[in-house]
Curated annotation (Swiss-Prot):
Residues 1-88 form the CARD domain. Key component of inflammasomes that indirectly senses specific proteins from pathogenic bacteria and fungi and responds by assembling an inflammasome complex that promotes caspase-1 activation, cytokine production and macrophage pyroptosis. The NLRC4 inflammasome is activated as part of the innate immune response to a range of intracellular bacteria. Residues 356-463 are annotated as: Winged-helix domain (WHD). Phosphorylated at Ser-533 following infection of macrophages with S.typhimurium (Salmonella). Phosphorylation is essential for NLRC4 inflammasome function to promote caspase-1 activation and pyroptosis. PRKCD phosphorylates Ser-533 in vitro. It is found in: Cytoplasm, Cytosol; Inflammasome. Keywords: Apoptosis, ATP-binding, Cytoplasm, Immunity, Inflammasome, Inflammatory response, Innate immunity, Leucine-rich repeat, Nucleotide-binding, Phosphoprotein, Repeat. It comes from Mus musculus. Homooligomer; homooligomerizes following activation of Naip proteins by pathogenic proteins such as S.typhimurium (Salmonella) flagellin or PrgJ. Component of the NLRC4 inflammasome, at least composed of NLRC4, caspase-1 (CASP1) and some NAIP protein (Naip, Naip2 or Naip5). Interacts with Naip5 and Naip6; following Naip5 and Naip6 engagement by Salmonella flagellin. Interacts with Naip2; following Naip2 engagement by Salmonella PrgJ. The inflammasome is a huge complex that contains multiple copies of NLRC4 and a single Naip protein chain. InterPro entries: CARD (IPR001315), DEATH-like_dom_sf (IPR011029), LRR_dom_sf (IPR032675), NACHT_NTPase (IPR007111), NLRC4 (IPR042220), Nlrc4-like_WHD (IPR053882), NLRC4_HD (IPR040535), P-loop_NTPase (IPR027417). This is NLR family CARD domain-containing protein 4. Its main location: cytoplasm. GO terms for molecular function: ATP binding; caspase binding; endopeptidase activator activity; identical protein binding; protein homodimerization activity. Changing S533A: Abolishes phosphorylation and prevents activation of caspase-1 and pyroptosis in response to S.typhimurium. Residues 163-476 form the NACHT domain.
Length: 1024
């Protein structure tokens, strides 16, 4: 009792929570502590408080209890006991004894038993040698946010080693091999960072049992007799950081089996030995809080994969295999995981030719290898039972994929022969310290393959019941987003397993596109490639945008299924039904190999696509050479000097048919030579209808005319922020078949004979957009003259034109003085005058097909209100009006009553813009009353920016505003407006009811953090 009293402070500080609870177990078993007292200790989360309580309880029970306490302490924490009793035995181990132990470990780590290992498990007789097959991994240091902050090599990791060091990575990333390599380097004596360690222990945590001493004895070597367990513990305590533990596979470790190792990791500050632990990312959460250094094993580099292949295969096999990998981006991607490199090598072993072109082939070979290698281990059952067990394994995997389940309990396998599946390795059984065993597939992707294999067999079965069962699984896939995100791999392996199964899958996917859903909505027909900003999406709902993105992924999914199926042209009809009417986006810098097969074997499908978009970007010539080495049909001598990838030329020019529509975008290209232009011409020739977009291309100055000469079927041209010469502009106006022309941000001075002067030559032009172009009044007059000749024009945008004087008077007159078919007119920020508006009003009867009229961002000076009222009074002739965006002038708010009267006849209005109308409370109430009596049910955009409304006025308006259920965007911006609390609360309630909102502009509203928190939602909120 005196001993405990004298050492009470040290005991409280050093015992630790694990040891305290172990001592509590002993004292409870010996009836020193009763049930209530033991529960007090078990429920105490603080280690020092738990130690304080158990010491107090023990001392109250007398000397006998104290003696039992010390005996238990000696058993569970010998280090502390030896220190406190003054019986430290470290002196009993001499330097010579320590050297003998270290040499024994080094001999082990240099022995074939340690260096030779089974990369696919001991059941598969394929052996790799650590010295010859180890390749340097890429690792990433993680910060406290668990973000990657620094790339590490093995050497830099060891130099910066802190304990505990946690190494995370998914299965198959080579974590175990990494620890074995560290042990081998220590044994060799050639690693400077490891020379400070006197002892290094490599431990497989999955088979750790008993204490630390017993585990080392079982796994590594016979520890010399002169080193007893107490002596060994004292030795570890003495050496501190001179001992390194390499603990492999915490994800397979059961702490109950070896509490000392658990304490070595989680209470490392007590042991002070260095520890490196590997675990899967999923299990990292159990130990991340104690890690002093966390590193993630990343992807295997291409060079490392090649080194590994060269180390395990003979030279002629390496050459054939590497050639196949270089031809397939799919295989190159799989080679980032060491496990798949090993499987690929295993496939090649014993074969004359490498055949693994697909992911399915890799898994199929591995699956068959498991069956072949291990089926002989199954004894005592009929062959039919064996086959049924395999089928049930597939059913288990299939049900798991649909239930998103990857761990299985015994009840899930009630009708299967578990011995068969566990014996041959299809399932792994986990039983240690479990009331019920758990079954898992060795890898999530392998479960998906097993499921796909089973689904394929069901769909191609001769038994109607099995076919019906297979179709029932397909019928669960009714959402495009689910197919692309949840079931993509399942379908990939299904199609890779059977051509007939592919036929069934593609028929189902075609039906999903026609009749399926995305979050309960029918599939959109929007162009799939378009990634537009929120400003240009205000006519659409959020669901529309989401559907477009998912349908684009759907097309990519279809092409991947074609590639995986290796069906070539056998299923041409089924694939054509799937691709009919869809769109495809291609990045010229990343053209996958399967597209060449797609164009070659399914030309009817490529022709069935409505739209193909191809993008070109500026690129360095050095970076492209490697990508061009394997371009089919292209032979180059020396470094390439072209900026258009020959791979793109090969794909499009060698194709024997034509696309319906091809859109080519040239972006940020600063150099373009004659060969590039020739290449573009070859690509352009593959389309019946060509669209050419040029964005920020300095190389186009003086070369656009040459590029356009190669375009025989160009119907659309868009030029943005790219300088043009007079010759370029003249040639544009000579392309008489042009239907759509867009010019943006052209700041060069208009020269005689240029684009503006000759625009009238484009007789077939239907859409014209001129945005931010340098013009003067004389240029505007010439433009007006040219517009008279464009009789087929349906859309005209003239935006952000300055310094054109009264030029808009001439332009408006030329557009409206005769009856025409113009459907969309945008004259935004273009010096529109009151006279222009008057002319437009007087001639509005000639524009009766107008559905979009946007003349916003124009300030009408003299007689502006009169002109605007005249225009408003004649709006009734526009029976198809859906968009109305008006200019402003002095006292423009007085025109609101007349406007509201006219809007009674336009219930289909989708956009209304009254920017800078300086609406007051009176006007906003009038607008609210109008919307209450004449609800614009289709209104999607409302712009009332530049108002003078008070909080009371907005409160009144909000009661009606919340009924605009289709609203996508609104702008109520103003200057220095402080909304009161009641308005903020009401606004928050209204916004929560407008579920389709994408963007809200409230610039000038002086919100604090509480206000922002109340009104924010899934939409974009702009307040500054």
């Amino acid at each position: 009792m005196n001993f405990i009293r004298n050492n009470r402070r040290a005991l409280i500080q050093r015992m630790g929570l694990t040891v305290t609870k172990q001592i509590c177990d002993d004292l409870f078993a010996l009836n020193v502590l009763n049930n209530q007292e033991a529960n007090v200790i078990y429920c105490e989360p603080l280690e020092q408080e738990a130690a304080r309580k158990i010491i107090h309880m023990t001392m109250q029970k007398g000397s006998a209890a104290c003696n039992l306490f010390l005996k238990s302490l000696e058993n569970w924490d010998y280090f502390v006991y030896q220190d406190l009793t003054g019986q430290n035995l470290s002196y009993q181990v001499t330097e010579e004894d320590l050297n003998v132990l270290a040499q024994n470990l080094k001999d082990l780590y240099n022995s074939p038993a340690f260096l030779n290992f089974y990369p696919l498990g001991e059941d598969i007789d394929i052996i790799f040698n650590l010295e010859k097959t180890f390749t340097e991994p890429i690792m990433w240091k993680k910060d406290h946010r668990h973000h990657r902050v620094e790339q590490l090599t093995l050497g830099s990791l060891l130099e910066a080693l802190k304990s505990p060091c946690l190494i995370e990575g998914e299965s198959g990333k080579g974590k175990s091999t990494l620890l074995q390599r560290i042990a081998m380097l220590w044994a060799s004596g050639g690693c400077r960072a490891l020379k400070g360690f006197r002892l290094v222990f490599f431990i497989h945590l999955r088979s750790a049992r008993g204490g630390l001493f017993e585990t080392l004895y079982d796994q590594l070597l016979n520890i010399p007799d002169f080193i007893s367990k107490p002596t060994f513990k004292a030795l570890l305590l003495k050496l501190h950081k001179e001992v390194l533990f390499l603990l492999d596979g915490y994800n397979e470790f059961h702490p109950q089996n070896c509490p000392e190792i658990e304490a070595l990791i989680k209470e490392n500050h007590r042991f002070k030995n260095m520890v490196i632990v590997t675990t899967t990312t999923e299990c990292l959460r159990h130990i991340r809080h104690v890690g002093a250094l966390t590193a993630e094993v990343g992807d295997m580099t291409e060079d490392s994969a090649k080194d590994l292949i060269e180390a395990v295969l003979v030279p002629d096999q390496v050459e054939r295999l590497w050639a196949q990998i270089q031809e397939s981006r799919c295989l190159r991607n799989l080679m980032k995981t060491p496990l798949f490199v090993v499987i690929t090598c295993a496939i090649q072993m014993g074969r004359q030719e490498f055949q693994a072109h697909t992911q399915t082939m890799l898994f199929q070979t591995f699956y068959d290898l498991l069956i072949q290698k291990n089926s002989h281990r199954y004894r005592g059952g009929a062959s039919g039972d064996f086959a049924r067990s395999l089928d049930y394994c597939g059913d288990l995997a299939l049900e798991g994929v649909f239930a998103h389940k990857f761990d299985f309990e015994p009840e899930h396998g009630s009708s299967m022969n578990e011995d068969v599946l566990v014996t041959i390795g299809l399932l792994c059984k986990y039983t240690a310290q479990r009331l019920k065993p758990t079954y898992k597939f060795f890898h999530k992707s392998f479960q998906e393959y097993t499921a796909g294999r089973r689904l394929s067999s069901l769909l191609t079965s001769k038994e109607p019941e099995e076919v019906s069962k297979g179709n029932s699984y397909l019928n669960k896939m009714v959402s495009i987003s689910d197919i692309t995100s949840l079931y993509g791999n399942l379908l990939l392996y299904t199609c890779g397993s059977s051509t007939e199964a592919t036929r069934a899958v593609m028929r189902h996917l075609a039906m999903v596109y026609q009749h399926g859903s995305l979050q309960g909505l029918s599939v959109t027909k929007r162009p799939l490639w378009r990634q537009e900003s929120i400003q240009s999406l205000r006519n659409t709902t959020e669901q529309d945008v989401l559907k477009a993105i998912n349908v684009n992924s759907f097309v990519e999914c279809g092409i991947n299924l074609f590639s995986e199926s290796m069906s070539k042209s056998d299923l041409s009809q089924e694939f054509e039904a799937f691709f009919q009417g869809k769109s495809l986006y291609i990045n010229s810098e990343n053209i996958p190999d399967y597209l060449f097969d797609f164009f070659e074997y399914l030309p009817n499908c490529a022709s069935a696509l409505d739209f193909v978009k191809l993008d070109f970007y500026e690129r360095a010539t050095e970076s492209q050479d490697k990508a061009e080495e394997n371009v089919p049909g292209v032979h180059t001598e020396g470094p390439s000097e072209t900026y258009i990838p020959p791979r793109a030329v090969s794909l499009f020019f060698n194709w024997k048919q034509e696309f319906k529509t091809l859109e080519v975008t040239l972006r940020d290209i600063n150099k373009l030579n004659k060969q590039d232009i020739k290449y573009l011409g070859k690509i352009f020739s593959s389309a019946t209808n060509l669209r050419l977009h040029i964005k920020r291309c300095a190389a186009m100055a003086g070369r656009l005319s040459s590029v356009l000469r190669t375009c025989k079927n160009m119907h659309t041209l868009m030029v943005e922020a790219s300088p043009l010469t007079t010759d370029d502009e003249q040639y544009i106006t000579s392309v008489t078949g042009l239907q759509n022309l867009s010019i943006h941000r052209l700041h060069t001075q208009q020269l005689p004979g240029g684009l503006i002067d000759s625009l009238g030559n484009l007789k077939n032009l239907e859409r014209l957009i001129l945005d931010d172009i340098r013009m003067n009044e004389e240029d505007a007059k010439n433009l007006a003259e040219g517009l008279r000749s464009l009789k087929k024009m349906r859309l005209l945008h003239l935006t952000h034109l300055s310094d054109i004087g009264e030029g808009m008077d001439y332009i408006v007159k030329s557009l409206s003085e005769e009856s025409c078919d113009l459907q969309e007119m945008k004259l935004v920020a273009c010096c529109l005058t009151a006279n222009s508006v008057k002319v437009l009003a007087q001639n509005l009867h000639n524009l009766i097909k107008l559905s979009i009229l946007d003349i916003s961002e124009n300030y009408l000076e003299k007689d502006g209100n009169e002109a605007l009222q005249e225009l408003i009074g004649r709006l009734g002739v526009l029976g198809e009006l859906t968009t109305l965006m008006l200019p402003w002038c002095w006292d423009v708010h007085t025109s609101l009553p007349k406007l509201l009267k006219q809007l009674e006849g336009t219930p289909g209005l989708a956009k209304l813009g009254l920017k800078n109308w300086r609406l007051r409370d009176e006007e906003i109430k009038s607008l609210g009353e109008f919307l209450e009596m004449n609800p614009l049910r289709d209104l999607q955009q409302l712009d009332l920016a530049g108002h003078c409304v008070s909080s009371d006025g907005w409160l009144y308006f909000m009661n009606v505003f919340e009924n605009l259920k289709q609203l996508v965007f609104f702008d109520f911006s103003t200057e220095e407006f402080l909304p009161d609390a009641a308005l903020v609360r009401k606004l928050s309630q209204v916004l929560s009811k407008l579920t389709l909102l994408q963007e809200v502009k409230l610039t000038g509203w002086e919100f604090d953090d509480y206000d922002i928190s109340a009104i924010k939602g899934t939409f974009k909120l702009v307040t500054a």
